[in-house]
Amino acid sequence: MESLWRAETKLPQFSRLEEDLQTDVLIIGGGMAGILCAYFLKQAGVDYVLVEADRICSGVTGNTTAKITSQHGFVYQKLVREFGPDGARLYYRANEEALAAYRELCRSIACDFQEKDNYVYTLNAPEKLEKEISALVQIGARAELAQPSALPFPTAGAIRFPKQAQFDPLKFVNGIAGGLKIYERTAVKSFDGKAYRTDRGTIRANKTIVATHFPLWNKHGSYFLKLYQHRSYVLALEYGLQLDGMYVDESGTGLSFRNQGDLLFLGGGSHRTGKQGGGWAELEQTARIYYPGAQIKYRWATQDCMSLDGMPYIGQYSKQTPDLYVAAGFNKWGMTSSMLAAGILRDLVQGKQNPYGELFSPSRTILRPQLAANAVEAVCNLLTPTKPRCPHVGCALKWNAQEHTWDCPCHGSRFGQDGKLLDGPATGDLSREK
């Protein structure tokens, strides 16, 4: 169950931290967001160190479908409603700038970067289509209605964003990570003030960026209330069909399509982590129906942090932690979100203003309908009298029969059949008692 990217690209390896050290900025987390933060800080001449508990890109970055787009489902009608046209326009501009930054960097990196139109389609909700295009017109986005002809089933229409992009994320990381100051297999266990303890050394940092997918600490920021996680699945098919762009269903449980070379990526089967969902079985059935004879070359799964309002949390970790920063809640759009997070955090740690800082601030209101849903989920699973329990906050774990893992429906931690930690926010393995 290895992704295409992991199978075909070998990343540079970095040593483990074996001593105490001091730095201006500590970056915790070696996925796309953390690595881009390190790259930008190096370019700015800022002293930094990045630490990764495993290997760089061993998490979501190595399992993405790697679409680079400012079209994040039918999100703009929601953003106009909740943040007004100005807020929605800022969100669009921030993501367009992220796309432009990738385009510029990829001029000198061999990472299969290709411009592609992106389509978000709907199967049966033309009214949502009309509301979305109206919101896009209102904010001045480059978008138009379209009738997708490349999909193997009828739709009620789509919205097209021209000149978006796709790439190979690990080849891209290969192009920028080689000269960065990185320590792998170096997990931060705790912190006291500005001292961060790892297995074999203490790092003293003036400022710290937490880019660990799900933030590490519950004490500040209430991220255990503000985030939940989703599983998604991908099949890479040998079929010989070349699409005219990238496609994704506006429904959170729908299908996505794109090519990578001669392969066709079929994504979907999504569900909240710890809940039942279609998984690979759903995708295999879809492939048999629409692409008969297709051979499965690769299959993999990924996990995404979802915010309460559809926008990432980027900025100061909490109001009580002035020198601690975070990037989290990318809502399945990690490529553009990683780039814009790196740009915002590069400025903030240097004491500079950023035009998008206020919009993405983690301290914005959490009074959203999803908050109540998250709270109900947590209470129900805390009261469920079964074992094993998640070491994060004690929720009852659910068995994932497709992936043979124990999954937490509260916050998304995952454990292997042997109890080994696979995904946070939990920071340790399951106890032997079950």
Language model segments and positions:
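C-terminal catalytic lobe of FAD-dependent flavoproteins
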Residues: 251-252, 280-282, 293-371, 386
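Flavin-dependent oxidoreductases
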Residues: 191-193, 197-259
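Flavin (FAD/FMN) cofactor-binding and adjacent substrate-gating region
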Residues: 2-7, 74-80, 103-172
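Extreme N-terminal leader/targeting segments of oxidoreductases
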Residues: 1-25
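Glycine-rich FAD pyrophosphate-binding loop
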Residues: 43-63
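Flavin-binding catalytic cores
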Residues: 240-243, 262, 271-306
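N-terminal Rossmann-like FAD-binding beta1-loop-alpha1 element of flavoenzymes
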Residues: 23-50
